[in-house]
Amino acid sequence: MKKLIAMINLMFVCLGITFAKDITISVGAGDNWKAKREPQVAIWLEDTDGNYIKTLYVTERASHKSWIMGPKEGRPESLPVWYHASKFKPAKNAAPDLKLDAVTSATPKGGIIFETELEDKAYVLRAEFNTSFDYNDFYTKKTSGVNGQPSVIYEAAIPADFNKSSEEIRLTFSGTGALDGSDGLIHKNTEGLTTAQTIVKLVAVVGK
């Protein structure tokens, strides 16, 4: 029986057929989740070489570019790492150059939870969060515009064999986005961050 299963699996590999696995992604709201403004959120997949694959979740305002009194160039600084990775233009009058096959919603009051499917491959899961007007003594209104503190990014490696029921992987903090949205790099300098680090209390992936 084991030999038969092994032969079937080998046949699927040779034919390039991959299996899908169900996962649940949850974001626990932190103390600063809605302290000043509702946060903007993007959650997406990359391959292990850092190439963008697809967006799994993004807040409506970021995806629809519906910024209140926002400039015509939009708000690239709101979710700069995601905007650059996905090549989704933040400008209000930009053409819809990217079709988002993702869960999209207004920011929930108490965190986020949704289900999705992944192929049996290795991935990097990234999540970016930002709250506008989140000023402090380091990121002042004079020096940081409407952004306040920069976006914060969390990530985790999802192995190809991640399909065990109730197995959990938690994303860890990996850095910040560009304060002015000028690049899509994850900056490791966290000097001056305060409340931005409490937008979320956890981001987790659970196998089903």
Stretches found by the model and what they are:
Residues K2-V13:
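Sec-dependent signal peptide recognition
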Residues I23-K36, R61, Y135:
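Short amphipathic, basic-aromatic surface patches that mediate peripheral association
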Residues G30-N32, T55-K65, R170-G181:
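Short, solvent-exposed aromatic-acidic interface loops
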Residues F114-L118, A122-K208:
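Glycine-rich, aromatic-bearing surface loops/beta-hairpins
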